[in-house]
Amino acid sequence: MSKKAKAIKKTNAMRLLDQVGANYTTHDYESTGAISGVEVAAALGQDPSMTFKTLVAEGAGRQSKGGGAERTKEHYVFVVPVAAELDLKKAAAAVGEKSIAMIRQKELLPLTGYEHGGCSPLGMKKQFRTIIDSSAADKETIMFSGGKIGLQIETAPAELAKALEFEYGEIV
C-alpha cells in the first residue's frame, strides 16, 4: 500500500488509508518549530499549489426557514492550498451556514486529536463534514498533513475519497 523510504510510526491518517487499500506516499521533513505550509512545501521540494492545509471552523449561524439565523455549533473541516487563505464567506456558503469562525488553537487537540501544524483531514476523533478546495479536483496528487508535525501524505484525490467522505467547493 504505502511507499516509504524508512519506517515511520503509523498515524491514524495512515491507518485509515491502509484499511481501505488506498495508495499513498509519505514524506517526512525536519520540524523546525512553527513552520508554515509554504515552508513545508519548500522543504519537501513540492509545488505549494499541490500542498494543502487542514483548517477547522465552527458554524456561527444557519439560515432558518423563517429567514432568521439559528446557532449551530457544528464543526467543519476545510482543506485549502497552503499558499491560499480560506474565504470565510465562501466556506460558510459551502456548508449552508450564515457565517463560520475558525476554532481557537487550544480547541484543536481536544476536538480533533491533532495538534496545530499536524492536523490531517483523516483520522480525527470524530468525522466532520469536510470541504476540499475545488483546485484539488484536477490534481494528479495532493499532499496534506499525515497527522503529526514533520509528516506529509501524498495521494490522488480519488485515493483520498476511499478513506474520507468529502465535497469539493470554491472556498478560497
Language model regions located:
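Extended, low-hydrophobicity, polar/charged segments
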Residues: 1-172
